[in-house]
Amino acid sequence: MSSYFLNSFSGRYPNGSDYQLLNYGTNGAMNASYRDSTSMHSGSFGYNYNGIDLSVNRPNNGHFGAVGDNSRAFQNPSQETRYRQSSCSLSSPDPLSCATSDTLELKGSSPPSDQSTPTGNSRLTNSNNLTSSNSTHFADTDETNVSSETEEGAQTTTTSHTQKQESVATSTTTPNDGQTPQIFPWMRKLHISHDMTGPDGKRARTAYTRYQTLELEKEFHFNRYLTRRRRIEIAHALCLSERQIKIWFQNRRMKWKKDNKLKSMSLATAGSAFQN
C-alpha cells in the first residue's frame, strides 16, 4: 500500500523533493520536517508567503532521500528565524525560546502584512469613529425631534387647557350677569324690566336726582308728549331707562292736568262771582 502511494505521488508530482511530507523517522528528521512544514503553510500564520519555487533542479538521490537538506533551499536564512518561532515549542534541540523569538521579531523588519495591519487598524478606527459620530448625530437629531414634538404637545395641551378654563369662566359668569347685570350708559338696553319691587312686594319709588328732574322739566315744558326716538335719547342722556322716562312723563302730565283743572275751576268760580 505504501509503495503504491509513493509511486502515485511521484507520478503526479515529478518534483517530489520539492513537496515536503512529514517523516516519522529519526528525531532530527522529525524536528526538521516540523520546522520546515511551516514554510508550506506560512499563510495561515499571517506571514508573507510567495509560493513554492519549482525552478530548483531535481536531485539524483531519490524523492525522499534528504528532506531536511532540500528544504533549506526554499527559504532564506533571515526568514528561518521568523518561521521558527511558530514551532518553537516543537523543536526541542534548538535553544531558541518564545521570548527570544519575540525579541528577534520586534528587532527585525516586519513583513508587509504586519506593516499593513496598522493602516488597516487606523482605517477601521476611523470608520468606527465616523459611524459613532453619525450615530450620535442621528441620536441628537432624534432627541431634538422628540424634544420638539414633546414641546409642541405640551403647548397644545396648555392652549386647550386655557381654552377650557376660558369656556368655564364664561359659563360661570353668564348666570351672574343674568342675576346682576352691570350695564353702562352706552350699553343700556332700553326695554329691560328692572326689578323695582320693595321689601313689601310693592314697586319701589324711583328717586330722581336734581339734575335729572331739571332736565325732565325742561323737556316737558317744550313737549308734553315724547316720541319713541326722543325718549330713547333722553334715557341715554340721563342714565335712565325708557320705561322710567315714560312713567315720569305720564305722571307729569297727570299733574299738569290736575293743576289746569284747578286753575280752570278757580277761574270759573271767579268769573261767576264777578258776574254776580
Swiss-Prot record:
A motif (Antp-type hexapeptide) lies at residues 183-188. Keywords: Developmental protein, DNA-binding, Homeobox, Nucleus, Transcription, Transcription regulation. Its main location: nucleus. GO terms for cellular component: nucleus. It comes from the Eukaryota. Residues 86-98, 121-136 have a biased composition (Low complexity). SUPFAM superfamilies: Homeodomain-like (SSF46689). GO terms for biological process: anterior/posterior pattern specification; brain development; cardioblast differentiation; cell fate specification; heart development; regulation of transcription by RNA polymerase II. Pfam families: Homeodomain. SMART domains: HOX. Residues 110-120, 144-182 have a biased composition (Polar residues). GO terms for molecular function: DNA-binding transcription factor activity, RNA polymerase II-specific; RNA polymerase II cis-regulatory region sequence-specific DNA binding. Residues 63-182 are annotated as: Disordered. It is found in: Nucleus. Sequence-specific transcription factor which is part of a developmental regulatory system that provides cells with specific positional identities on the anterior-posterior axis. Belongs to the Antp homeobox family. This is Homeobox protein Hox-B5b. It comes from Danio rerio. The lineage of its organism: Eukaryota, Metazoa, Chordata, Craniata, Vertebrata.
